Amino acid sequence: MSGGMQNGTQETERRVIDINDRHTVNVGPQHPATHGVLRLIMELEGETVTRADPHIGLLHRGTEKLIEYKSYLQAVPYFDRLDYVSPMCCEHAFALATERLLGVKVPERAQWIRVLFAEITRILNHLLNAVHLALDIGAQSPSLWGYEEREKLLTFHEAVSGARFHANYFRPGGVSKDMPTGLAEQIWEWSEKFPKFLDDLQSLLNENRIFRQRLVDIGVISAEDALAMGFSGPNLRASGIAWDLRRAQPYDKYDEVDFDIPVGRHGDSFDRYLVRIREMAESLKIIRQALKAMPEGPIKVQDHKITPPKRAEMKRSMEALIHHFKLYTEGYHVPAGTTYTAVEAPKGEFGVYLVADGSNRPYRCKIRATGFSHLQAMNLMSKGHLLADAIAVLGSIDIVFGEVDR
């Protein structure tokens, strides 16, 4: 046998052995570490990941199509069920998009209330992600602390909307109802105690040897790759890009508040965790500024073709009663036009491309889910790491499948 043929045979044998050494594992969709219904098909050499292939769609409900058959007001609750960890921020994008097409200006108080609850929602989201990331890699205590703190914030949600999660609170034209008496004082009192909790959480995790070993230099993504993959939010900022829509394209009252944009340097899982921790402190600053700056006044536009009249007014005025009936049976007609409106949701850029045809229903509502872009980088970030590290990477990018699958 010639040398060339012999080398070729050896190469073929080596390739066969390499392929046979690999095995395929299904992670999920019914697994607590996948944070929902993700199915990850992972190709492993021993315990080292050579390929991670996310399979999505198991929570697809046809949200975008369903919205086309609802009035603009009836469409709002669908947004609560997208990123159900931070529902008010999803409502925010749709409300802003509809208002832009309607050409209405929301009252000052309503804008400040939106900013206030958008930041409370951001803390709810980041807190859940931080303690669940710790839980994914074996630390149980932080999750117990975190849930206790989240319960206080969910009480504020419930006070304004009547619901802990599916708030249906941000409406086109303002918010559904005003903050109850005493709630602002309760939020202020909570804001004075929260920094101590945040310090305690960091003292438990930041310098913990096992926590750092599981996250530092794991799932690194460069700034160039993050931009190419369409990253946004904390995942992009952890790679060193200081991009935040609240600063770059301010909406509501974000141009009147002072806050810093935390940025990472290494783009690894630990930086993604740290950016979210720092963002909670910045959100707290915004909450306190919003409480100080919030004026008295109406909480929705005074056009009763868009927002309902007060109950007392309906008992006195037939016109108000007709407005109420028309609003909740037919809805309002939005002038023909298109808009893309995005907000800085806790997970990144959550956008709504809204097409109106002059009727009382959206002609098209395309939703830009933040997690969709982040999930496609799982293969890039997991390759070469151990299987257990891939779970840590997944936890660090903060995925919710309500919005990914829609």
From Swiss-Prot:
Reaction(s) catalysed by this chain's protein: a quinone + NADH + 5 H(+)(in) = a quinol + NAD(+) + 4 H(+)(out)
Q: What is the protein's major site of localization?
A: membrane
Pfam family of the protein (one): Complex1_49kDa
Where in or outside the cell it occurs: the entry states:
Cell inner membrane
Looking up NCBIfam families in the UniProt record yields: NuoD, PRK06075.1
* Protein purpose: NDH-1 shuttles electrons from NADH, via FMN and iron-sulfur (Fe-S) centers, to quinones in the respiratory chain. The immediate electron acceptor for the enzyme in this species is believed to be ubiquinone. Couples the redox reaction to proton translocation (for every two electrons transferred, four hydrogen ions are translocated across the cytoplasmic membrane), and thus conserves the redox energy in a proton gradient.
The annotated subunit structure for this chain is: NDH-1 is composed of 14 different subunits. Subunits NuoB, C, D, E, F, and G constitute the peripheral sector of the complex.
This chain's protein is named NADH-quinone oxidoreductase subunit D
Gene that encodes the chain: nuoD
